[in-house]
Regions:
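Bacterial signal peptide processing site
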Residues: 21-24
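Extended alpha-helical interaction scaffolds
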Residues: 27, 34, 154, 158, ...
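Charged, long alpha-helical assembly modules
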Residues: 191-204
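C-terminal motif of bacterial Sec signal peptides marking the signal peptidase cleavage site
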Residues: 16-19
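Bacterial N-terminal signal peptides that target proteins for export
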Residues: 1-10
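Post-signal peptide N-terminal segment of mature Sec-exported envelope proteins
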Residues: 27-57
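Mature extracellular/secreted ectodomains of secretory-pathway proteins
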Residues: 70-194
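Short acidic, Pro/Gly- and aromatic-enriched capping/linker segments at domain boundaries
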Residues: 47-49, 56-79
Length: 204
């Protein structure tokens, strides 16, 4: 769930639009900036829609940043692959692997939904910033209004994603308990759940 590009675009757009005067070429530049932002957002939304489709059809990578571990993936039907080769799995192991993938897919889907909502809000924020310029609002007023709107729309979705994490952790533990080959990749713990649940810094 990486929404930092949204923040960059919001900040850049708000500053650029607020810097324009509502007369002459300044207003024209602001309008051009809004059109450019709209095109960029359309492209981002297209990529997110494609990513949503891939959640169902493509393998999930299980490897974290630890380069010492071999490449591991989980197929759509719950098969564990190590370096591209299928790991021997019993019916129980495959069932638990599939249950883990289902939980992962739910979390990833929520993350993509956050990105899609953010793309829409980016356009809304840019349009509001342009209106703010026309209304003579200050830079701070425009920025605060944009940030408040983003928090109002995005925060509930982030909370929904966080609420999924306990089930994901439980599924991870259940599979790791019966699948030794998966254990090195089962790195999520209670602290990850708590960090998400207790996060109060909603600076998008």
């Amino acid at each position: 769930m990486n929404i930092s590009p949204l923040r960059v675009m919001l900040c850049a757009g708000a500053v650029a639009l607020a810097a324009c005067q509502p007369v002459g070429n300044g207003l024209a530049q602001a309008q051009q900036g809004l059109e450019k932002a709209s095109a960029q957002m359309d492209s981002a939304k297209g990529e997110l829609v494609e990513a949503q489709k891939k959640l169902v059809t493509e393998n999930f990578s299980l490897k974290d940043d630890d380069s010492r571990l071999p490449k591991a993936e989980l197929t759509p039907d719950g098969q564990l692959l190590i370096e591209g080769k299928p790991v021997a799995m019993s019916a129980e192991q495959k069932t638990l692997g599939l249950a883990y993938r289902t939980q992962m897919q739910g979390v990833a889907s929520d993350g993509i939904a956050i990105g899609m909502e953010g793309a829409k809000l980016g356009i809304d924020a840019a349009a509001s910033a342009l209106k703010g310029v026309l209304a003579g609002k200050s830079d701070d007023e425009i920025s605060q209004q944009a940030e408040a709107t983003v928090k109002q729309k995005i925060k509930p979705r982030v909370e929904q994603l966080c609420a999924r994490l306990p089930a994901l952790l439980q599924a991870q533990r259940a599979w790791a308990a019966v699948q030794p080959e998966f254990r090195p990749y089962a790195t999520m713990d209670e602290s990850d759940v708590k960090d998400c649940m207790n996060k109060q810094d909603w600076n998008f």
